[in-house]
UniProtKB/Swiss-Prot annotation:
Residues 1-15, 74-82, 129-144, 190-226, 276-286, 336-347, 400-409 are cytoplasmic. Disulfide bonds: none annotated. One of its GO terms (cellular component) is plasma membrane. NCBIfam families: PRK15402.1. It is found in: Cell inner membrane. Its main location: membrane. This is Multidrug transporter MdfA. Efflux pump driven by the proton motive force. Confers resistance to a broad spectrum of chemically unrelated drugs. Monomer. It comes from Yersinia pestis bv. Antiqua (strain Angola). It holds the Pfam family MFS_1. Keywords: Antibiotic resistance, Cell inner membrane, Cell membrane, Membrane, Transmembrane, Transmembrane helix, Transport. PROSITE patterns: MFS.
Length: 409
């Protein structure tokens, strides 16, 4: 049964309530990763495990974020966005409380995987609903502004985690994540609209396979989805590996480690604010081009400085900050163009985008760990530069294949 929903053309107070509730859950899910990373050294010490488990916590979390996306997009298309999203938020709250019962590093990592499943619902269900609820110019502004709120997590997470671990056990963090998730659940219950276009239709494996096959056969969609993954990989690799690089490698304190996150994620927020200001005045492809220069130059600075001296962590931070500004400027527009590169229902398209990105993140973070173990910060930053160059090549192909109407709007 086809259903229709008229996208909002402006941001009233009522229209904003849903994205604010969604971004609170996104914040909880992200800070559940970023805040625990500086505390992972305490976790591995409690379980008598090696520091090699530190980035594995994030790998498991992102692997969980890939696990069910293939199902949740089509499921929410046919069963409704609201019930699927609410079930995901509730599951996240339960798993955050369940981790308090673990007694080994293996159990901890397994529970991190289950918590990561909450990420599936943000992309495959939540953001699909956002894209369907608002017209393009409004949607890009919302996406950019939501990204700023969500990015408070990696900005404040390392600082808050480093501070909290000195005064309370790491388990306290997961109680906080559960409380944030519960508040988000209450808000989404009240405010989330139902935008599913195929609600009431039968969910079948054959139909799912047909839809995914059609989406993945779209070369422009593939270029955009792969580009989105490689764009964010250096940032996520930094979040995962920076406790080892800065605290274990450079012998910095947890407070100094947290301070060095501020310019990187502050630049990311500035990039998103710049995007919100330019949106509607500049074409989306041009915004992506504006972001490309800072991204590649920043990654080159980070790689070049550490090739000169493996302890040049301040220059590395400066380079990653410039890169972060570029990704803040380019990413939201690329998400929008990629999502609408296919005519298949947006739950399925969003799920496919999420699976491709999460696969790149999961494998890439482990490869970044290997690069660091093999070549210290030199290998790590060369890996990030390779990721940025792959993004650049894919984006060039993506923009070249775009419809004429998009190129000139």
């Amino acid at each position: 049964m086809q259903t229709s929903f008229s996208p909002a053309t402006r941001l009233g107070r009522r229209a904003l309530l849903f994205p604010l509730c969604l971004v609170l859950f996104e914040f909880a899910a992200y800070i559940a990763n970023d805040m625990i990373q500086p505390g992972m050294l305490a976790v591995v010490a409690e379980f008598n495990a090696s520091v090699e488990w530190v980035p594995t916590s994030m790998t498991a979390y992102l692997a969980g974020g890939m696990f069910l996306q293939w199902l949740l997009g089509p499921l929410s298309d046919r069963r409704g966005r609201r019930p699927v999203m609410l079930a995901g938020v509730a599951f996240f709250v339960v798993t955050c409380l369940a981790i308090l019962l673990v007694n080994s590093i293996e159990q901890f990592i397994a529970m991190r995987f289950l918590q990561g499943i909450g990420l599936c619902f943000i992309g495959a269900v939540g953001y699909a609903t956002i894209q369907e609820s608002f017209e393009e110019a409004v949607c890009i502004k919302i996406t950019a502004l939501m990204a700023n709120v969500a990015l408070i997590a990696p900005l404040l997470g390392p600082l808050a985690g480093a501070a909290l671990i000195h005064v309370a056990p790491w388990q306290t963090m997961f109680v906080l994540f559960a409380v944030l998730g519960a508040i988000s659940f209450a808000g989404l219950w009240r405010a989330m609209p139902e935008t599913a276009s195929l609600k009431g239709e039968k969910l079948s494996v054959a139909n799912m396979w047909r839809d995914y096959k059609q989406v993945l056969a779209n070369r422009r969609f593939l270029c955009g989805s792969l580009a989105l993954g490689f764009a964010s990989l250096p940032l996520l690799a930094w979040i995962a590996q920076s406790p080892v690089i800065l605290i274990s490698g450079e012998q910095l304190s947890t407070f100094e480690y947290g301070i060095l996150q501020v310019p990187i994620f502050g630049a990311l927020i500035i990039g998103n604010l710049t995007l919100a200001r330019l949106s509607g005045k500049t074409s989306i492809p041009q915004l992506i081009r504006y972001g490309a220069g800072p991204m590649i130059v920043g990654l080159m600075i980070a790689a070049g400085s550490t090739l000169y001296s493996s302890h040049a962590y301040l220059w590395m931070t400066a380079g990653l900050s410039l890169y972060a500004f570029g990704i803040g400027l380019a990413n939201a527009g690329l998400v929008r163009l990629t999502l609408f590169a296919s005519d298949i229902s947006k739950g399925t398209v969003s799920a496919a985008m999420g699976m491709i990105s999460m696969m790149i993140f999961t494998l890439g973070i482990e490869l970044a760990k290997v690069a660091y173990l093999w070549g210290d910060s030199r290998g790590f930053n060369l890996f990030n530069l390779m990721s940025g160059l792959l993004w650049l090549g894919l984006v060039m192909v993506f923009i070249r294949r775009q419809p004429e109407a998009v190129a000139t709007e």
